[in-house]
């Protein structure tokens, strides 16, 4: 990168290849400090210290979206809470003419990084990731953009064979830069200096998704009228309506964990995403991830999200809805029964998750899929044993299958 940080083609949170800072390379102490110290060091390129610190318009017309999913979803290979909104199109969007669903820059700035997943992942259809710097303190990331439009098209014209373009294309607030993805949705993230959270162990993100501490709620950065319009499309009404990804509580089981000595968020990059017989993505960098946190819509329910439970990433709730913040260092091992769940409307009617309603609820099922034993240790680590097919009552103590997780 321009800041002297080595890059490597890594797998991102969607199981796609992309370029990111690589901790496996020779990183100096200064570069390591930079990687956790500023957005410009993370995203690279030039930035304007005096540029916008807030958005001045939206990323598109809210009337074009069916609904918006807030920050914090944990879903299959997205084991830890995701750092982006999902902007869902109507189900007939693939039948609309090109140009029907435009994506715009939310403030003045410059496109500094574009990745072409068609080249990087050998996909048969166009799919782009765009990074926009609005200032040294405000960045926008858009993923699964189906076509680059206007000035942004220059990046595609100049795209290297490796699928990663770096440069500087000035854009204005409201300028159309993309068209509807051929997928059902696109991802939208905001990263801001004033949103930075002091993580328990920020170095766990140095090797992958090093922007995580700067994850902002995009609704906090729009003009009031845009925020109001976007909130109306949100499937969550609990405040903050835009959700959050930050659930770590030191000294408890709640939050995000990684198997010790597996390179933090980046995980074991030798594992490529494959499809299991059940159709789920299995065996990826997320194998070593664990998150125990509130659901992103039904926030009263705690989700136990694991990257490798019997060979695939899964999310469960627990019998009794055990609150992980009550499991603290110094206590005895806790063992919970893991339950699959379905979805209902707020009044208890069955609901299709692909046609969600506001404030839907999780409905735990009765069949026990297995159990999870865990104990928070005095040094801040956690001993964890995943027990597919075994209920909590059968636990007699940790076995050789137990692993140590760290923040």
Could you describe each region identified by the protein language model?
Residues 1-28:
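Tryptophan-rich substrate-binding surfaces of secreted polymer-degrading and adhesive proteins
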Residues 3-4, 14, 283-286, 291-300, ...:
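Short, solvent-exposed coil/turn segments at beta-strand boundaries
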Residues 27-128, 136, 172-173, 215-345:
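Surface-exposed, glycine-biased beta-strand/turn segments
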Residues 96-99, 104, 133-176:
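Short histidine-centered loop motifs in beta-beta connectors
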Residues 119-120, 147-148, 184-185:
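A short acidic/small-residue loop/turn micro-motif
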Residues 127-132, 168-192:
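Short hydrophobic beta/alpha edge segments that flank linear recognition/processing sites
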Residues 141-144, 192-232:
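Short peripheral tails and domain-boundary helices/loops at the edges of structured domains
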Residues 321-407:
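Beta-sheet ligand-binding and adhesion/scaffold domains
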């Amino acid at each position: 990168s321009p800041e002297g940080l080595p890059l490597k083609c890594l797998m991102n949170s969607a199981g796609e290849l992309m370029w990111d800072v690589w901790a496996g390379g020779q990183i100096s102490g200064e570069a390591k400090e930079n990687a956790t110290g500023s957005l410009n060091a993370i995203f690279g390129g030039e930035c304007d210290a005096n540029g916008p610190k807030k958005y001045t318009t939206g990323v598109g017309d809210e009337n074009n979206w069916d609904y918006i999913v807030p920050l914090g979803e944990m879903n299959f290979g997205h084991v830890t809470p995701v750092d982006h909104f999902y902007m869902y199109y109507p189900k007939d969007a693939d039948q609309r003419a090109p140009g029907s669903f435009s994506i715009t820059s939310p403030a003045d700035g410059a496109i500094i990084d574009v990745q072409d997943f068609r080249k990087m992942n050998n996909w048969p259809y166009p799919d782009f990731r765009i990074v926009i710097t609005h200032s040294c303190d405000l960045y926008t990331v858009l993923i699964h953009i189906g076509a680059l439009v206007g000035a942004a098209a220059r990046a595609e014209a100049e795209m290297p064979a490796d699928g990663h373009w770096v440069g500087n294309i000035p854009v204005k607030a409201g300028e159309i830069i993309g068209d509807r993805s051929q997928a059902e949705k696109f991802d939208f993230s905001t990263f801001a200096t004033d949103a930075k959270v002091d993580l328990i162990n920020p170095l766990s993100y140095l090797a992958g998704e090093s922007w995580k501490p700067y994850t902002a709620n995009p609704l906090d950065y729009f003009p009031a009228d845009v925020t109001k319009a976007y909130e109306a499309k949100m499937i969550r009404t609990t405040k903050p309506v835009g959700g959050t990804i930050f659930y770590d509580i030191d000294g408890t089981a709640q939050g995000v964990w990684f198997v010790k000595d597996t390179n933090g968020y980046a995980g074991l990059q030798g594992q490529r995403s494959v499809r299991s017989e059940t159709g789920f993505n299995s065996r990826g960098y997320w194998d070593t991830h664990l998150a125990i946190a509130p659901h992103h819509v039904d926030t009263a329910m705690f989700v136990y999200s694991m990257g490798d439970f019997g060979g695939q990433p899964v999310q469960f709730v627990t019998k009794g809805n055990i609150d992980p913040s009550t499991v603290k260092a110094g206590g005895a091992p806790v063992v919970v029964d893991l339950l699959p769940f379905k979805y209902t409307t707020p009044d208890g009617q069955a609901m299709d998750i692909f046609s969600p309603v506001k404030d839907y609820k999780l409905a735990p099922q009765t069949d026990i899929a297995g159990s999870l034993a865990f104990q928070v240790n005095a040094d801040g680590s956690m001993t964890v044993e995943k027990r597919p097919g075994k209920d909590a009552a059968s636990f007699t103590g940790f076995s050789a299958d137990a692993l140590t997780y760290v923040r």
